[in-house]
């Protein structure tokens, strides 16, 4: 049996129900975060939550009611599902409004949805995995607030709607920005480089983790 969390309750996955009048469904009006769990431990939880808070503040979406107990809820969900390695998906939309209107009601109660799926870390298979990847390079024609981890990912979906490619690398004004589902690192003349943080890229948590690691190793 697999469990999710919706608003104030743990719910069996097959029983999760969200209104079609939710602004996340109608407008893609929401933000999300994905936190990996390795051997039962949350990876860089505080950093992920800080980015989630930034997304909420940038979009002026109200935080969920149980914000102070949020980590407790997440850890209980991890225990209930029992996978050693998991991917915790957190989505917060602006909430449900009966009248469809582009302009939001700032008193609307947000919808909180948390889901857990098993994360497969098959090291032996990865050692034998393909070493070459098919990548497409294209101009970034998505919106200009990629620093917000928004659920509106249609641009990314359209870019990746091709079974022949593994990833898309975006560029804007001649400069590489990010991948459709990744941050970019490159070794140039023996120096590791990555695009600087701006509104054109999402500040990856793992990206920053490796930057800090590289600086320590010098």
Where are these regions (language model features)?
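Ordered, amphipathic secondary-structure segments that act as subunit-interaction surfaces
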Residues: 79-92, 99
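Helix-start/capping segments and mature chain N-termini
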Residues: 1-76, 98-218
